[in-house]
Amino acid sequence: MGRGRVQLKRIENKINRQVTFSKRRSGLLKKAHEISVLCDAEVGLIVFSTKGKLFEYANDSCMERILERYERYSFAEKQLVPTDHTSPVSWTLEHRKLKARLEVLQRNQKHYVGEDLESLSMKELQNLEHQLDSALKHIRSRKNQLMHESISVLQKKDRALQEQNNQLSKKVKEREKSAQQISGINSSSLFAHTDFYLGTYQSTNVIDNGKWKEVVLHSSKVQLIIL
């Protein structure tokens, strides 16, 4: 005789119901993983327990991407079949979908900061770890890029300041050189022009600061006469 079909009905005993849920849930997640690997299918599985605890599986570790794809597909199907989008039923379904998606996003956000990890299996924890490692690599890459850009800007500013400093030093040296030349001209402007003798007197014409002057020598005494 063939094996009789077991009638499916709700398990009344809470303990047995919880044990059965845990076993069937593990088997369901395993089957979802198997079909995704064997058939190269994109699988997303969402299960809520009677207490409202969420269990999920996504073969590509991104449930959001699967949900977005499902929404795009559902939207395309709705475009082919005319429906009354203004009906209360349509708005209720849309609200439920958005609420479910919001819950998924909030839960994933908690997972990313290390909260509410008790509900995750080993595989889910490994997937989460992989996501965080990938995110950290992108963060470090962006941080290093910004650091290199900041260093490049500082180096350009440093070169500009050095160039300004060199120009200022050059101008100072040119001014010092000009001042020395002017000082040398002034010191050499006092020179003898003619010498002549008048009896016991000796006179000499000189130029001092652009003015002609006559120096008269009498014995050992020198008299300066300004013309």
UniProtKB/Swiss-Prot annotation:
Q: Name one GO molecular function term.
A: protein dimerization activity
Task: List the record's Gene Ontology CC terms alphabetically.
Answer: nucleus
Residue stretches in coiled coil: none
The record's listing under SUPFAM superfamilies reads: SRF-like
Summarize the protein's role: Probable transcription factor.
What is the protein's name according to its record? Agamous-like MADS-box protein AGL8 homolog
Which key words tag this protein in UniProt? DNA-binding, Nucleus, Transcription, Transcription regulation
Keyword Oxidoreductase in annotation: no
Question: Which PROSITE patterns did the record assign?
Answer: K_BOX (PS51297), MADS_BOX_1 (PS00350), MADS_BOX_2 (PS50066)
Task: Tell me which Gene Ontology terms the entry assigns under biological process.
Answer: positive regulation of transcription by RNA polymerase II; regulation of transcription by RNA polymerase II
Give the organism, scientific name. Solanum lycopersicum (Tomato)
- InterPro entries the UniProt entry points to: MADS-box/MEF2_TF, MEF2-like_N, TF_Kbox, TF_MADSbox, TF_MADSbox_sf
Query: Domain MADS-box: where?
Result: 3-57
What is the tissue localization of expression for this protein? Answer: Flower specific.
